Amino acid sequence: MTQLETRTEPMVVNFGPHHPSMHGVLRLVVTLDGEDVVDCEPVIGYLHRGMEKIAENRTNVMFVPYVSRMDYAAGMFYEAVVVNAPEKLADIPVPKRASYIRVLMLELNRIANHLLWLGPFLADVGAQTPFFYIFREREMIYDLWEAATGQRLINNNYFRIGGVAADLPWGWLEKCRDFCDWFGPKIDEYEKLITNNPIFRRRIEGLGVIGKEEAINWSLSGPMLRASGVPWDLRKVDHYECYDDFDWDVAWEKEGDCFARYRVRIEEMRQSLKILRQACDMIPGGPTENVEARRMAEGKDSEFAGFDYQYVAKKVAPTFKIPNGELYTRLESGKGEIGIFIQGNNDVTPWRFKIRAADSNNLQILPHILKGHKVADIMAILGSIDVIMGSVDR
């Protein structure tokens, strides 16, 4: 009896651009041999809106409201780096109080980013319930943002050259502390439900392994890099804002797989809580002071009229001209390094404005780590990268 030859030609399958697990309008052209992934070609650009060219035709204050539409899970990070670039180029100082307020907003955004990663990632691997839990906590962060900026998810439009748009309202720091007290036990709850769940562990351990040298050579950043054994965090490396004032640790793992990336993000949320608590206690002007009221009551000789107690160094005029020169500035977002290359031409608009998105770089390694895995593992590996197509395509 002759044996039938069952081997077939490789099959090309399209995932996306409209697929629930694509995390936006991403299209993957996957070549399969049975259930094994032979090749993968990401097709991007469906959400390209020309953000860099828009920036080159707007003043800085005009462009800030645009940036949270790139990565709607990291709007504060993009606002921060967009104002940091002209600040450093023009050597504009930032008051200590404004720097602390910025750190508070950035760390809240880091937690919100990781929560919005955690829920869909677990849904991708088959756990639907945590998706509802994470929005319970995010709702409290939205409330804090709304109290300080007037907006909840995107278009906070809060960062300004030299500081922030407005001081924190009275009682905001107490509400932020309440959130920290509430959210700490919730992380423990997530760990009990997820981390040692045998089904979850067997589903993602050993998937999408990236070695230390690979991670560096592919220019990965953020949790993708730190999960591969490289404790590189720009908050420690570049010493920007006032992060050196706080006691916190860099979260990192050695395994380099999907589970390690999950562990890094969980630990980063704990470290963000440590920073938030310290910032609430150490902010210049006191933790419960209404600085503006004290300044007005005590007159111009009040200590609260000093530079470090301001929320903005000097309101930049609409005719503020970006000086000649070029500069690259960067910061650590929830997804990794986001950076701005700015080239000034002594004009109100920049001559060149290049945006480096963290998830855009991290996505490039996807075809490399997918090869040899099963088709069912595509969603888990892609989900562990944490991409938002608005910032990938820009």
From Swiss-Prot:
Q: Which PANTHER family match?
A: NADH DEHYDROGENASE [UBIQUINONE] IRON-SULFUR PROTEIN 2, MITOCHONDRIAL (PTHR11993:SF10), NADH-UBIQUINONE OXIDOREDUCTASE 49 KDA SUBUNIT (PTHR11993)
Family recorded in the similarity comment: Belongs to the complex I 49 kDa subunit family.
Using the UniProt record, name the top-level EC class of this enzyme in a single word: translocase
Q: Which reaction does it catalyse?
A: a plastoquinone + NADH + (n+1) H(+)(in) = a plastoquinol + NAD(+) + n H(+)(out); a plastoquinone + NADPH + (n+1) H(+)(in) = a plastoquinol + NADP(+) + n H(+)(out)
Q: How does it sit in the membrane?
A: Peripheral membrane protein
Q: Does the keyword Heme apply?
A: no
Return the protein name. Answer: NAD(P)H-quinone oxidoreductase subunit H
Quaternary structure note: NDH-1 can be composed of about 15 different subunits; different subcomplexes with different compositions have been identified which probably have different functions.
- Output the GO biological process annotations, alphabetical, semicolon-separated: photosynthesis, light reaction
Record-listed E.C. numbers: 7.1.1.-
Show the taxonomic lineage. Answer: Bacteria, Bacillati, Cyanobacteriota, Cyanophyceae, Synechococcales
Q: What is its main location?
A: membrane
Q: Does the keyword Flavoprotein apply?
A: no
Q: What is the documented function of this protein?
A: NDH-1 shuttles electrons from an unknown electron donor, via FMN and iron-sulfur (Fe-S) centers, to quinones in the respiratory and/or the photosynthetic chain. The immediate electron acceptor for the enzyme in this species is believed to be plastoquinone. Couples the redox reaction to proton translocation, and thus conserves the redox energy in a proton gradient. Cyanobacterial NDH-1 also plays a role in inorganic carbon-concentration.
Subcellular localization(s) per the UniProt record: Cellular thylakoid membrane
Per the record, its GO cellular-component terms are: plasma membrane-derived thylakoid membrane
- Pfam families tied to this protein: Complex1_49kDa
Q: Per its UniProt entry, which superkingdom is the organism in? A: Bacteria
A GO MF label: oxidoreductase activity, acting on NAD(P)H, quinone or similar compound as acceptor
Q: Which UniProt keywords apply?
A: Membrane, NAD, NADP, Plastoquinone, Quinone, Thylakoid, Translocase, Transport
